[in-house]
UniProtKB/Swiss-Prot annotation:
The gene is iolG. It catalyses: myo-inositol + NAD(+) = scyllo-inosose + NADH + H(+). One of its GO terms (molecular function) is nucleotide binding. Homotetramer. Keywords: NAD, Oxidoreductase. This is Inositol 2-dehydrogenase. One of its GO terms (biological process) is inositol catabolic process. HAMAP family: IolG (MF_01671). InterPro entries: Gfo-Idh-MocA_inositol_DH, Gfo/Idh/MocA-like_OxRdtase_C, Gfo/Idh/MocA-like_OxRdtase_N, MI/DCI_dehydrogenase, NAD(P)-bd_dom_sf. It is an enzyme of class 1 (oxidoreductase). Involved in the oxidation of myo-inositol (MI) to 2-keto-myo-inositol (2KMI or 2-inosose).
């Protein structure tokens, strides 16, 4: 069976997913598209040679008789309504982050999915599909380094645009760490604090950069995450787990080591899409396979809710300077196991 997918949102990430659905992945094809800018939808159909219907409204894509699953890559504030509509139609939906722009919105999706009685939602957190993170989790779960005590992490971007704001360091950048570190450790966060080092001269006037986020988990693991979105030198993701008996570190992407002119060097990537390109492929293929097999296994609506609750606390901590509690609702049995 070839899974027939409708895509809502034909911007950069939407077209990137259309590209992989059309040229890289197997078992699916795009049969319907929509974008708030109709020309973008038409351009996507032309660019990728799609035999797809262009709809004027995303809800029409969800309702289309030939659409068996939905891909939501539209503007963040529209995600909740489209995901809820897909659940109401009983159609599996892959939603790029954020699942919703508030924790309350994520909870509404959780409640709708639980009421439906079957997992239909996968959230676009791709780092759990990265080979390096998977290898790191294997080491942690094996017990080789003992119980994790501390994590030292960094999320560095070469630069960001003028529209990037201080809170986006949490909602657009740290959100990936909030998901993947919770997955690595298998436990939830209990508190967050944000501190501000000396500001880089490369940041715009309205942006606090860099920032350091301090998290604590239910078992007492302490996590520090450096967010530096104007680091200049490249795109760099770091994660070091300090255990009772040893240390495990996320590997850097493979690169050729160069010795030349009395120097030893290794190239550093500058594009986040390049750094995690394989993970994007694997996560979307997992969604396709999960729908076809009747069992989604990727990041769930509950994972989207958990990340949103933690992000809300981090934003409060940015503003208050205090240690902010992270209080989550009880996890439904539907999402356990």
């Amino acid at each position: 069976m070839t899974l027939q997918i409708g895509v809502i949102g034909c911007g950069a990430i939407g077209q990137d997913h259309i590209r992989r659905l059309t040229r890289t992945l197997s078992g699916a094809r795009v049969v319907a598209v929509n974008d708030i800018d109709p020309q973008q939808a038409r351009d996507a159909v032309t660019k990728y040679g799609l035999d797809a219907e262009i709809y004027g409204d995303g809800h029409e894509v969800v309702a289309a008789a030939d659409v068996q699953a939905v891909l939501v890559t539209s503007w963040g504030p529209t995600h909740e309504a489209f995901v809820l509509d897909a659940i109401a139609h009983g159609k599996p939906v892959f939603c790029e982050k954020p699942l919703a722009v508030t924790a309350q919105g994520c909870m509404r999706i959780v409640e709708a999915e639980v009421a439906h009685g079957r997992r239909l939602v996968q959230v676009g957190f791709m780092r759990p599909y990265d080979e390096g993170y998977r290898a790191l989790k294997h080491v942690i779960d094996s017990g080789e380094i003992g119980a994790p005590l501390m994590l030292h992490c960094a999320h560095r971007n070469q630069s960001v645009g003028e529209r990037y704001t201080t809170d986006m360091a949490i909602t657009d950048t740290l959100i990936h760490e909030l998901d993947v570190l919770r997955w690595l450790l298998g436990e939830d966060y209990t508190s967050a604090q944000v501190v501000y080092p000396k500001k880089t001269r490369h940041a715009s006037a309205h942006l606090a950069d860099p920032q350091i986020v301090l998290l604590e988990t239910a078992s007492g693991v302490r996590i520090d995450v450096e967010i530096f979105v104007n680091c200049q030198y490249g795109y760099d993701i770091q994660c070091e787990v300090v255990g009772e008996n040893g240390i495990a570190k996320l590997p850097d992407p493979p690169a050729v080591g160069l010795k030349h002119a009395a120097r030893r060097s290794v190239e550093i990537m500058t594009d986040w899409k390049e750094r995690f390109i394989a993970s994007y492929d694997v996560e979307l293929q997992a969604f396709i396979d999960g729908v076809r097999q009747g069992a989604l296994t990727g990041p769930s609506a509950w994972d989207g809710y958990a990340a949103a609750v933690a992000a809300d606390a981090c934003v409060r901590a940015q503003q208050s300077g205090a240690v902010e509690p992270i209080a989550m609702a009880e996890r439904p049995a539907f999402y356990r196991g």
